[in-house]
Amino acid sequence: MNKENMPEIKIGVVAVSRDCFPESLSVNRRKALMDAYTKKYGKDHIYECPICIVESEIHMVQALEDVKAAGCDALVVYLGNFGPEIAETLLAKHFDGPKMFIAAAEESGSAASDCTRLYQQYLRV
């Protein structure tokens, strides 16, 4: 592929989570995404933000500052569980560049069972 006319960009990936789930669920899903991407395309144009936003504007500001400091030109908001909430949409609003939201597919096996059980406890079903 001729890449002469393609811009060089750096994509920042920020995971988000709901507070009714363990943060590690989104973090582990983000790591799996990053592993799959870097295995196929390398590490040159992608950055894994170490801050996971857990329904907090404080986390959002920290993540925004982190991806800016890392020199990211584009943003991927990785929904580790459930859809966008206030903090994630504010992150997209305040990031000056292209951005997109992507969502994790639900795993099978024990991880999916754990998620269902935790969410039922959260809802007190």
Per-range role (PLM):
Residues 1-125:
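Metallocofactor- and cofactor-centric catalytic cores in central/energy metabolism, strongly enriched
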